[in-house]
């Protein structure tokens, strides 16, 4: 007899309204990917992406699987509690569970810790047979070969341009102090067989997709070969890369030829001192203009990742950053407040210094609150400066200044900027919730 399984992609309620209005939003790959490992002879599968679907609490399931990120951890625990009261078993996995399994175990029946290619299928078989254990831990790095194609057919698609997603590589060679990637994945960079990646891309119904890689250009020969094989498919895509790799004309030429629309690049700051604080010395502000001009030369847009709130940032950082973005022709910006995620060097430093102000993970989303005491401004100044920067950056005058420099994919560029502009008109924050939780974490 088949067991009924529900896989949930939870959405951070603090920023869901903001994300829905972004035209360049893209789908999450996790639950369609996990669903592909499930034997439909043993399980009846239901997928729910909370971004655009409601969780069916009124339906009985045997097993609930939830992927947990730090900002939505408490929300996931609430979902788990409701289903467990109804008699369902709950398995939790994802970044937050991997980082804090001792916390997560109090809110579920089973844990998947670390990468799941080996442990998830084993758990599913054990659960079906009635002998599942509490913890499944990834001991060795999974070989990313012969992986199943994500079950996009089971998912209600988001209203977005980028309706497809695939990953070709896993890992990143760098050690940024705010990033918890090294604590989530095995510390080794891996690639998938190129023919398997191309086959998976061919299965995507949408022409537009995103590479869900942490650093797509890390292995140059692999990336170039993959892009050469991608070119005949006439797809349009985006990926996350590092700035230094974009000085390479061979990579950019292959990206343009294979349909690259934009590259997400973590600039993080326009201050070399702040970049040192971030542990991102691979970026040099003196290189920004030349490399960004090089990217634009190949008609590829730049979506810059920018973080406010490093210890060397002052109240002047917002206006200085805006001027720099306009001078460089930055096409789009994904802007965040520095978030001391658990197990990162920045989290450990701030905890030791007594500067963490929240013990509720919902404050750790980088968008709607400040979870620590900044060094050179108040939390209110940091938040207000962040909000003001986004409004100014996505204003029409700023767009005109930037597009005059960029001159890249103007229609798409305008649509992308308009989407962000509509999204930031009203801060996505619950009225009953304090913005700055001044409860010191010991």
State what each model feature region is.
Residues 2-208:
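Acidic, low-complexity intrinsically disordered segments
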Residues 3-7, 40, 44-47, 62, ...:
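Radical SAM enzyme core and accessory elements
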Residues 12-16, 103, 221, 273-278, ...:
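Flexible glycine/acidic-rich beta-alpha junction loops that bind and position SAM and/or redox cofactors
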Residues 38-44, 291-302, 328, 392:
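A structural motif corresponding to the C-terminal end of an alpha-helix
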Residues 68, 72, 96, 112, ...:
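Structured beta->alpha junctions
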Residues 91-92, 112, 135-136, 238-240, ...:
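Structural detector of well-ordered beta-strand residues that form the stable sheet scaffold
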Residues 103-121, 254-264, 320-335:
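Structural recognition of alpha->loop->beta junctions
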Residues 148-303, 308-310, 316-319, 323:
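Radical SAM [4Fe-4S] cluster-binding motif and immediate context
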């Amino acid at each position: 007899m088949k067991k009924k399984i529900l896989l949930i992609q939870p959405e951070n309620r603090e920023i869901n309204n903001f994300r829905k209005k972004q035209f360049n939003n893209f789908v999450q790959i996790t639950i369609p990917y996990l669903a592909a490992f499930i034997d439909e002879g043993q399980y009846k599968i239901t997928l729910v992406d909370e971004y655009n679907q409601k969780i069916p609490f009124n339906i009985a399931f045997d097993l609930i699987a939830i992927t947990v990120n730090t900002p939505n951890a408490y929300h996931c625990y609430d979902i788990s509690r409701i289903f467990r009261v109804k008699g369902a078993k709950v398995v939790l996995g994802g970044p937050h569970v991997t980082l804090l399994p001792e916390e997560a175990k109090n809110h579920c029946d089973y844990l998947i810790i670390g990468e799941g290619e080996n442990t998830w299928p084993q758990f599913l078989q054990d659960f079906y047979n009635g002998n599942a254990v509490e913890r499944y831990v990834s001991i060795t790095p999974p070989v990313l070969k012969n992986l199943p194609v994500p079950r996009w057919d089971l998912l209600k698609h988001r209203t977005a341009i980028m309706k497809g997603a695939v990953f070709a590589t896993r890992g990143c060679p760098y050690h940024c102090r705010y990033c918890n990637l090294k604590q989530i994945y095995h510390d080794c960079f891996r690639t998938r067989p190129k023919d398997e990646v191309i086959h998976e891309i061919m299965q995507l119904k949408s022409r537009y997709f995103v590479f869900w890689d942490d650093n797509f250009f890390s292995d140059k020969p692999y990336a170039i070969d993959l892009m050469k094989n991608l070119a005949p498919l006439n797809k349009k895509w985006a990926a996350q890369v590092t700035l230094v790799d974009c000085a390479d004309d061979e990579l950019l030429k292959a990206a343009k030829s294979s349909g690259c629309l934009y590259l997400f690049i973590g600039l993080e700051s326009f201050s070399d001192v702040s970049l040192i604080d971030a542990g991102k010395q691979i970026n040099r502000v003196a290189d920004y203009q030349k490399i960004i001009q090089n990217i634009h030369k190949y008609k590829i847009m730049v979506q810059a990742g920018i973080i406010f709130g490093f210890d060397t940032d002052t109240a002047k950082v917002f206006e200085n950053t805006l001027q720099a973005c306009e001078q460089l022709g930055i096409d789009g910006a994904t802007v965040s407040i520095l978030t001391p995620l658990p197990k990162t060097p920045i989290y450990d430093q701030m905890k030791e210094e007594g500067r963490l102000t929240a013990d509720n993970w919902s404050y750790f989303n980088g968008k709607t609150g400040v979870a620590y005491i900044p060094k050179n401004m108040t939390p209110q100044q940091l938040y207000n400066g962040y909000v003001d920067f986004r409004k100014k950056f996505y204003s029409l005058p700023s767009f005109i200044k930037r597009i005059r420099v960029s001159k890249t994919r103007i229609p798409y560029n305008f649509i992308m900027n308009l989407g962000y502009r509509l999204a930031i008109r009203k801060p996505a924050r619950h009225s009953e919730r304090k913005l700055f939780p001044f409860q010191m974490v010991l």
